[in-house]
């Protein structure tokens, strides 16, 4: 059992300084429109050349009228107005249900050699610069590179639609999915602010990484960031749910021993395994009022962890339906998940998080909410996102993105100043709500190839979001005897010097003198803010081996003696 998906299937710039090089900082003050745009840059602040809308009565191609308003039949209209450095997209449809908007700008895009998009939630080892593929859906933003310039196009964080891009030789298209679950959106008299389209022209000689990081900062005006670098332990990749009060205390003691003695204290996180449903009584799944019998006095245990010198954290699954939940609370797509549009469900989530905060947890990692809503992992969502035939309890009057926004706002409000890690969250919608985001799928304490694929890839291709959207979490170093230390220590070294967060899972029988020395060195580095790691060969591979770390170029060997395991 090496992944959380395996387990599921088996059981049915802030106070934290970015310390960026001057070139990166200067690159953030770029205007979005120029009188003479550089080669290959598409001006997306102008009116699109085509606007069409997929409705419950068919696809309508709208006609541009006065005042940047595109008009169709039955009162259907789309506004495309430039405001505050963006093209703001507004939707009105008093009579027709709407599935998706398509906006297209005709412009030559075939001068670019490579293209990079983002992911709906986490990366799955599948992020990469690729040559032109017209049907490739790229969530949230797309960067283009022609060998000199890196141009970028996207929507600001906090969009009210699930947005993706497609690029072909003759133009660039934005698709905005405004469905409510799988049902056409019924707006009535409401006007939906769909998204804000932004773009950034590249400059020579900035690298593609510097350009994309600057664009990520442009897309998110107000990231919520922790006051200090985040580092510590999480027990999942050695315990895999077989944790207890004793292992929690032991982990806290060990991470404190390995960490520097300054005021930025390490975290000790109990992952999945402490809650009632993972104890002897399986009927407690989805309840969080108390811990299971393995943690008989959780509030007292939390106090002991703090006395040891660690900051306690815990895992939480907000949309898991308790067996006692009434049918009215359950999601139409899957009754095992809660429907967050139900007021009582939001009250339950708020009460759960308030309780965990009052117990004394300094960090809460909430998980599974995207899977519980859509019924698909990020790599399965594609352009359809979810299966057909369902909507939310409140009716199809709000987009799925709006429902997610309400859920995240509920979590944030209840957590107050407790740090939040979003795992399996919609990254572009979580920015500004949560301090940290798991940017890739699970690494492993049993399979090196999985850590190599998921961890290295997600760090390389989403480190551009570090400090711009949130603190990026490329996942843990699973310190166990199942993975050769010669390989794992490289992942540890990269993460510790990356400027992102560092968590380790520490199997007691895998901690020899060499491991302890390497871990102590890594914790000392990670506890102080470092410059963001820049992958140097990321345009040639999905798992970069050459990196710029703390101002120096480094090379890693991820292959080991055996190379990658079969997929």
Regions found by a protein language model. Give the residues of each.
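Secretory targeting signals
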Residues: 1-2
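N-terminal export signals
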Residues: 6-27
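Cleaved targeting-peptide boundary
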Residues: 28-34
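Carbohydrate-recognition beta-sandwich/jelly-roll modules
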Residues: 37-266, 363
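A generic structural motif
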Residues: 116-119, 262-272, 530-540
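Active-site-proximal substrate-binding groove within the catalytic cores of carbohydrate-active enzymes
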Residues: 177, 188-196, 234, 244, ...
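Residue-level signal for short, function-critical loop segments
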Residues: 237-239, 318, 500
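Aromatic- and carboxylate-enriched substrate-binding clefts and catalytic-loop regions
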Residues: 264-481, 515
């Amino acid at each position: 059992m090496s992944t959380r998906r395996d387990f599921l299937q088996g059981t049915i710039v802030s106070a934290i300084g970015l310390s960026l090089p001057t070139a990166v900082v200067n690159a953030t003050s770029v205007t979005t429109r120029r009188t003479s745009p550089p080669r290959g840059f598409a001006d997306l602040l102008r009116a699109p050349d085509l606007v069409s809308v997929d409705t419950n009565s068919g696809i309508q191609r709208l006609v541009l009228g006065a005042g940047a308003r595109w008009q169709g039949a039955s009162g259907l209209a789309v506004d495309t107005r430039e405001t505050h450095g963006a093209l703001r997209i507004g939707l009105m449809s008093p009579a027709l249900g709407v599935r998706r908007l398509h906006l297209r700008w005709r412009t030559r895009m075939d001068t670019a050699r490579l293209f990079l998009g983002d992911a709906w939630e986490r990366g799955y080892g599948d992020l990469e610069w690729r040559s032109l593929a017209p049907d490739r859906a790229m969530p949230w933003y797309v960067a283009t590179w022609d060998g000199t310039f890196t141009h970028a196009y996207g929507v600001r964080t906090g969009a009210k639609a699930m947005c993706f891009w497609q690029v072909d030789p003759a133009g660039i298209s934005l698709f905005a999915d405004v469905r409510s679950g799988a049902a056409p959106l019924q707006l009535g008299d409401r006007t939906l602010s769909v998204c804000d389209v932004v773009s950034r022209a590249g400059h020579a000689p900035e690298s593609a990484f510097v350009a994309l990081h600057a664009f990520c900062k442009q897309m998110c005006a107000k990231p919520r960031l922790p006051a200090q670098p985040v580092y510590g332990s999480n027990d999942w990749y050695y315990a895999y749910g077989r944790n207890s009060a004793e292992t929690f205390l032991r982990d806290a003691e060990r991470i404190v021993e390995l960490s520097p003695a300054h005021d930025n204290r390490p975290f000790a996180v109990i992952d999945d395994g402490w809650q009632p449903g993972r104890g002897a009584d399986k009927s407690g799944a989805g309840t969080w009022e108390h811990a299971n019998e393995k943690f008989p006095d959780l509030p007292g245990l939390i106090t002991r962890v703090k006395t040891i010198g660690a900051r306690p954290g815990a895992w939480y699954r907000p949309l898991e339906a308790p067996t006692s939940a009434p049918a009215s609370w359950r999601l139409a797509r899957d009754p095992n998940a809660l429907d967050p549009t139900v007021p009582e469900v939001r009250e339950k989530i708020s009460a759960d998080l308030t309780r965990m905060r009052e117990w004394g947890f300094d960090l809460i990692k909430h998980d599974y909410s995207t899977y519980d809503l859509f019924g698909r992992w990020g790599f399965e969502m594609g352009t359809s996102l979810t299966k057909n035939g369902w909507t939310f309890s409140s009716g199809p009057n709000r987009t799925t993105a709006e429902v997610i926004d309400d859920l995240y706002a509920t979590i944030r409000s209840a957590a107050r100043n407790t740090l939040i890690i979003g795992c399996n969250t919609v990254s572009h919608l979580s920015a500004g709500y949560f301090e940290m985001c798991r940017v890739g799928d699970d690494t492993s304490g049993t399979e090196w190839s999985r850590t190599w694929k998921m961890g290295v890839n997600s760090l390389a291709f989403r480190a551009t979001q570090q400090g711009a959207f949130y603190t990026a979490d490329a996942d843990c170093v699973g310190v166990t005897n199942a993975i050769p230390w010669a390989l794992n220590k490289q992942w540890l070294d990269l993460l510790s010097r990356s400027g992102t967060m560092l968590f380790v899972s520490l199997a007691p029988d895998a901690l020899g003198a060499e491991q302890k020395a390497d871990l102590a060195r890594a914790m000392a580095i990670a506890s102080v803010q470092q410059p963001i790691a820049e992958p140097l060969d990321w345009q040639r591979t999905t798992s970069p081996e050459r990196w710029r770390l703390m101002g120096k170029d480094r090379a890693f060997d991820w292959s080991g003696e055996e190379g990658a395991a079969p997929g």
